[in-house]
Amino acid sequence: MRNLQLSIEREVERAIEGVNLKDTRRCYRDQSEFVVLERFLTQPVVDQLLYEVDLLTPDVNRNYIPGHKKGGSVSFYALQNQAPAILSLYRSPAWLMFLSRLVDAPLMLCPEDDPHSCALYYYTQPGDHIGFHYDTSYYKGRRYTVLIGLVERSEHCRLVARVRKRGETEEIRETRIPMDPGTAVLFNGDTLWHAVTPLGKGEERVVLTLQYVTDQEMGP
C-alpha cells in the first residue's frame, strides 16, 4: 500500500508539472469556477484506476429516478475496502495542494462518513444519464467537484456544462465535454448547471468523482 501511494504521488506530481498554473487559474476564474484539464493524469495512474474499475464492477449499484437519472455507482464505502489507487489519488497531498491553489482556498477531504466524497459512476446501459443539476453543498463552506474520465467509449454520452462568464448573468455557451481517460474537470458544485446526456446502445462510460470542501462541518 505504501509503495502504491508513493507511486501515485510521483505520477500526480508529474501531471501537475505539465500544467501552466497561472493560465489555468485565469481560465477557472473567467469561467465562473470551472475548468477542464484534458488528459491530465498520466497513463500509469489511469491504468491503476482502470484496474480497480474492473475489480469493482460486481459492486455497482444501479438506480433509476424518473426524470432525473439512470445509471450505476460504487460509493466511497466500497472504495475504502477495494480501491487503494483511487483512495491514494483522492488523498494525494500534491493533488490537494494543486486544487487548493487553483480555487484559491485551502481544500480538505470530505468526512469519512460522506458516501459521495469519492465515488465511481458507471454508464453501461442505453439511456443512462443524469439530468441538469447543481452539486449542492450542505457543508458550511464550499464544496468542489472533480470529475476524472476513465472509460469513454461513447459518441452520445457527454458531460454538458452551461458555463457563464465571470461577472455576467448571461449564459455564454453550453459545453459538451468528452471525458477521455485521464481528463479532469474541476468546478464549484453550487455554481455549475450541468448534466450527462444519455448513453447510446453498445456504449460504455465510467467516471470517478472526487469531492473536496473548505469546511468539514455541515450547515444548518
Predicted regions located by residue number:
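Short amphipathic alpha-helical segments
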Residues: 1-5, 212-220
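Non-heme Fe(II)/2-oxoglutarate
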Residues: 2-8, 12-102
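A sequence-level detector of short, solvent-exposed, charge-rich linear segments
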Residues: 3, 56, 60, 68, ...
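Residue-level detector of conserved, well-ordered beta-strand and adjacent loop positions
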Residues: 38, 197, 209
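Generic structural "secondary-structure junction" signal
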Residues: 43, 78-81, 91, 122, ...
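Catalytic core of non-heme Fe(II) oxygenases with the double-stranded beta-helix
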Residues: 87, 97-192, 203-207, 214-219
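Short, Lys/Arg- and Gly-enriched loop/turn segments at beta-strand edges
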Residues: 193-199
